[in-house]
Structure formats: structure tokens, C-alpha cells
Amino acid sequence: GYKITIDTDKCTGDGECVDVCPVEVYELQDGKAVAVNEDECLGCESCVEVCEQDALTVEEN
């Protein structure tokens, strides 16, 4: 599995991670990304690549 860390101070809620994730891990809540389906994460790191704020980290656990 994978552990997703979201730096809410950096996150601007642009939703890029929501759009790019192939397994719908993220949704926006109160203008911030939340990893609601972390168990589905494939570890592809597409979200990390598209996040202009560098707010996401994905680590294998």
C-alpha cells in the first residue's frame, strides 16, 4: 500500500490531483484535496507530478 501526505498549507485546491488520479483517490473538501480513497492508490505519482504547489508526497508503506 501507499501513504499519501497532503501539505494543507501548500494546497490551493486547484483539483489537478483529483482530475489526474486514475483511481479517484482524491476529492476536494473545503477547498483542499483530501485522500478519501488512499487504499486505492497505485503509487503512480501522477498527482505529485501535476501538483504545482508541491503539496503531495506518496510513499510506499
UniProtKB/Swiss-Prot annotation:
Keyword line: 3Fe-4S, 4Fe-4S, Electron transport, Iron, Iron-sulfur, Metal-binding, Repeat, Transport
User: Is Repeat given among the entry's keywords?
Assistant: yes
- Tell me the function of this protein: Ferredoxins are iron-sulfur proteins that transfer electrons in a wide variety of metabolic reactions.
Cofactor binding comment, as recorded: Binds 1 [3Fe-4S] cluster.
Q: Which positions does UniProt annotate for [3Fe-4S] cluster binding? A: C11, C17, C51
Taxonomic superkingdom: Bacteria
Q: What is this protein called?
A: Ferredoxin-3
Q: Which residues bind [4Fe-4S] cluster?
A: C21, C41, C44, C47
Q: Where is the 4Fe-4S ferredoxin-type domain?
A: 2-31, 32-61
Q: Which cofactor does this sequence's record say it needs?
A: [3Fe-4S] cluster; [4Fe-4S] cluster
Q: State any single GO MF term.
A: 3 iron, 4 sulfur cluster binding
